[in-house]
Amino acid sequence: MNHCGTKTLETERLILRKFRLDDAGDMFRNWASNPNVTKFLIWQPYTNVDDVKAYIQSCIDCYEKADYYNWVIEYKENDQAIGNISVVELKEHTLCTVIGYCIGEGYWHKGITSEAFSKVIEFLFEEVGVNRIESTHDVNNPNSGRVMAKCGLKYEGTLRQSDWNNQGICDAAHYSILRHEFTGK
């Protein structure tokens, strides 16, 4: 892989960029403190902005690593940080990345997550040189699967009781897209 770190990416409505400490208020307000947002995630809702700042600082500290990819999703319409998308796992030997994402409840069902994910897919295939991009979701969160399908990922199957989140042990639906499916070559 040609690791190049978290570069700023832009779409029609979004700027995907590195976290900044001044994103803490938006992050807390727009997604990180909302139990509806974190319901199917592995981290509990944040209860104060100071803990959000500590998380953001940990991200900032990792940005010097060329193989660290973690973007805040900034909505151009209001210049607010409204979610995040990241590579949660790198599988160097198979040129594979696993993507995770979350977005504030006020921004659900607007195509924002799929817009961000599509841009990250393009970046990972074209600049980083991955061969496979994976993502999974709790089967009780079908909207996440719709995002994956909209971005061109193919459903590969469900592994029963193979994952966990804030709901406990869960069935995980697995999706992926391969480089040749993205490029058509």
Kindly give the residue locations of the regions a language model identified.
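Acyl-donor (CoA/ACP) binding surface of acyl/acetyltransferases
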Residues: 1-26, 30-35, 57, 70-185
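Hydrophobic residues in alpha-helical segments
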Residues: 31-32, 41, 63-64
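Conserved GNAT-fold acetyl-CoA-binding loop/helix
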Residues: 38-58
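Short, surface-exposed helix-loop/turn micro-motifs enriched in polar/charged residues
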Residues: 43-44, 65, 95
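A short hydrophobic/aromatic micro-motif that marks alpha-helical segments and, especially, helix-coil
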Residues: 48-50, 63, 167
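Short loop/turn motifs at secondary-structure junctions and domain boundaries
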Residues: 62-66, 153
